[in-house]
Amino acid sequence: LSINLNKVLTFERSGGKTIFKQLHFLLGGKVMSGNKEFFYRRLHSLLGVIPVGLFLIQHLVVNHFATNGPEAFNKAAHFMEQLPFRYALELFVIFLPLIYHAVYGVYIAFTAQNNTSRFSYLRNWLFRLQRISGIITLIFVSWHVWETRIQAQLGAEVNYDMMANILSSPFMLGFYIVGVLSTIFHFANGLWSFAVSWGITVSPRSQRISTYVTLGIFIALSYVGLRAIFAFV
């Protein structure tokens, strides 16, 4: 930016001091707005891993108990229901972080720019898939909460039979397969972005290694998730 000091001084002496201050305020406001945007994105990234991502892993592990039969799953589900301060944990550790991550994620999905037309490498396509999987995950999680947590508040019992009844429909079985895989992909691919944005993987080599690690996480969790789904069928 090139500034002519004589013109600035002339501008201020000629009565432009107030306007100059207003311009400075607006520029400062823009910087502050940028700082807020940076903070919101960092918070979105952090909450996607801690606690939302950790809850996803825990939820998949609990569901995987269904592979050992109805009794094993019901026992694991009952254990989770008996946790101390359960409702406070659900509100502050799960639902509020999840709502923020989802709402701000939708904002990012509809405002971020695609680079796939200019750059054809894998990472840009994964960036696009991250946004698509986020929307699918939001739809799936919202429906899953309605079918389980909301129904539980209305008097239904969350147990093996509930999930078996839901997944007895071929449509719902397909919906859950797509939803679970989208959710796991969104988490695993999000880990890659998290590591980059938080300065954990800076070099190209570390980012390549991170790609393989997150791919392994996606495969491992997908195996757990799909086994759990078919255990109810």
Task: Put a short name on every predicted segment.
Residues I3-L5, F20-V233:
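Membrane-embedded alpha-helical bundles that constitute the cytochrome b-like, heme-associated redox core
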